[in-house]
């Protein structure tokens, strides 16, 4: 009886060759296709997998779970890798790998496989998730397998093999970039972009218009949150209202994209140590992250906010590096959910030519006291108390300066 392997399958050249290669090695290959919002023909992908040799194909729509359990969860900690990247690819991988493990368990498969390369982050994200959720599963990673590497030294070898085995391949001109698309973002890498000094042509971008070509009129959105989670968005100009999580996020993508929001060009540090340039388009999440952070300004205690902000870079790093299912992630999420208990209210954002600008906010749990903050009203605050406050905080500075002068003599 053949041993079963569940392959994370995209329908592209790499995973199609891997599927056939696994079949020829004697495996019963079950292809698993995850719909996380990429614009693919899933019926065609399923047909291609079956023709290539898969005994069964799972095509699953994970978009809603991606939004509610992954994107919105990352929002709780304002996850942003190296202060800039909103982690669109990294957030999707644990969801895909989790479902792959569940299918393997359902099918009684002994193996799981993926087509991630040996230089990138995705190999780590997939395999750490496998290990965390089912340590008994064996992993087949062809791009780290000596036999596979000896047979396929590059794209030409893959194409020749596909043609030899009758695997359908696209003959149309391919975009000269490596791209990953899901509901949260689209990323562009490789090709000319590997030169960090190269200024990308406008044709790199496929989701967003250039801010220069965006409408000359602002869009005002009112975004509502409950305990840090988005629950409603209202367009204050045309009255459009969305409350369903998936529809809400798709609408923010639509509004952000046509207003040139969410473009990012950066060089980042991959987990394995290689620096990589990525060009990203993340319109909807950029709007959400900005609005959410603004609401925290009036609802979160100062020290809680600052402590959370100290932990946020670690949170983003864990997501980026593939530790979504880990004890430290459970710890951080428990803390973040506690910190978000009063992050309830609404924020109005002005969206204009690539910018997302909060212009108003309200919360029933607001810690903002107009009288205390007023420049005109004393409001129960005794200004003379500040003298002692400053003296106490100045004490160590005075001592430090006296000692410093003493050392200089």
From Swiss-Prot:
As one GO molecular function, the record gives: argininosuccinate synthase activity
- Tell me which stretches of the chain form a coiled coil: none
Which GO cellular component terms, listed alphabetically, does the Swiss-Prot or TrEMBL entry include? cytoplasm
Q: Name one Pfam family in it.
A: Arginosuc_synth
Please write the reaction equations for the catalytic activity of this protein.
L-citrulline + L-aspartate + ATP = 2-(N(omega)-L-arginino)succinate + AMP + diphosphate + H(+)
Q: Which UniProt keywords apply?
A: Amino-acid biosynthesis, Arginine biosynthesis, ATP-binding, Cytoplasm, Ligase, Nucleotide-binding
Record's subcellular location: Cytoplasm
One GO BP on record is:
argininosuccinate metabolic process
Chief location bin: cytoplasm
Residue sites binding L-citrulline per the record: 85, 121, 125, 178, 187, 268, 280
Q: What is its EC number?
A: 6.3.4.5
Specify the pathway.
Answer: Amino-acid biosynthesis; L-arginine biosynthesis; L-arginine from L-ornithine and carbamoyl phosphate: step 2/3
Q: Which SUPFAM superfamilies match?
A: Adenine nucleotide alpha hydrolases-like, Argininosuccinate synthetase, C-terminal domain
Give binding positions for ATP. 8-16, 34, 115
Q: Which InterPro entries match?
A: Arginosuc_syn_C, Arginosuc_syn_N, Arginosuc_synth, Arginosuc_synth_CS, Arginosuc_synth_type_1_subfam, AS_cat/multimer_dom_body, Rossmann-like_a/b/a_fold
Q: Which residues bind L-aspartate?
A: 117, 121-122
Protein family per UniProt: Belongs to the argininosuccinate synthase family. Type 1 subfamily.
User: How does this chain assemble?
Assistant: Homotetramer.
What this protein is called in its record is: Argininosuccinate synthase
- Record the organism: Thermotoga sp. (strain RQ2)
Source organism phylogeny: Bacteria, Thermotogati, Thermotogota, Thermotogae, Thermotogales
- Gene (UniProt): argG
């Amino acid at each position: 009886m053949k041993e079963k392997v569940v392959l994370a399958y995209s329908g592209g050249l790499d995973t199609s060759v891997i599927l056939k290669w696994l079949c020829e090695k004697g495996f019963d290959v079950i292809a698993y296709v995850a719909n996380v919002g990429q614009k693919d023909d899933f019926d065609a992908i399923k047909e291609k997998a079956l023709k290539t040799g898969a005994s069964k194909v799972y095509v699953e729509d994970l978009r809603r779970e991606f939004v509610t359990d992954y994107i919105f969860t990352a929002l709780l900690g304002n996850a942003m890798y190296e202060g800039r990247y909103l982690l669109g690819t990294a957030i999707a991988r644990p969801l895909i790998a989790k479902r792959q493990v569940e299918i393997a368990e359902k099918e009684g498969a002994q193996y799981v496989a993926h087509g991630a390369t040996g230089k990138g982050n995705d190999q780590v994200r997939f395999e750490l998730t496998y290990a965390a959720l089912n340590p008994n599963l064996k992993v087949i990673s062809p791009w780290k397998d000596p036999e596979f590497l000896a047979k396929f030294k590059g794209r030409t070898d893959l194409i020749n093999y596909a043609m030899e085995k009758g695997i359908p391949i696209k003959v149309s001109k391919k975009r000269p970039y490596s791209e990953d698309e899901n509901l949260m973002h689209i990323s562009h890498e490789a090709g000319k972009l590997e030169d960090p000094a190269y200024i990308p042509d406008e044709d790199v971008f496929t989701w967003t218009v250039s801010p220069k070509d965006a409408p000359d009129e602002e869009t005002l959105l009112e975004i509502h949150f409950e305990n840090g989670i988005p629950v409603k968005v209202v367009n204050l100009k045309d009255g459009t209202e969305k409350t369903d999580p998936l529809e809400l996020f798709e609408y923010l993508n639509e509004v952000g994209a046509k207003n040139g929001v969410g473009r990012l060009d950066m060089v980042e540090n991959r987990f394995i140590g290689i620096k990589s340039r990525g060009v990203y388009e993340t319109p909807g999440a950029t709007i959400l992250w900005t609005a959410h952070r603004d609401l925290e300004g009036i609802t979160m205690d100062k020290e809680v906010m600052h402590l959370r902000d100290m932990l946020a870079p670690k949170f983003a790093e864990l997501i980026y590096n593939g530790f979504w299912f880990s004890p430290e992630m459970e710890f951080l999420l428990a803390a973040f959910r506690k910190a978000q208990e009063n992050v309830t209210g609404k924020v109005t954002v002005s969206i204009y030519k690539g910018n997302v600008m909060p212009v108003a906010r309200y919360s029933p749990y607001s810690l903002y006291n107009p009288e205390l903050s007023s420049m005109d009203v004393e409001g129960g605050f005794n200004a003379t108390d500040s003298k002692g406050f400053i003296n106490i905080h100045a004490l160590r500075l005075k001592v430090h300066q006296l000692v410093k002068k003493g050392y200089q003599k």
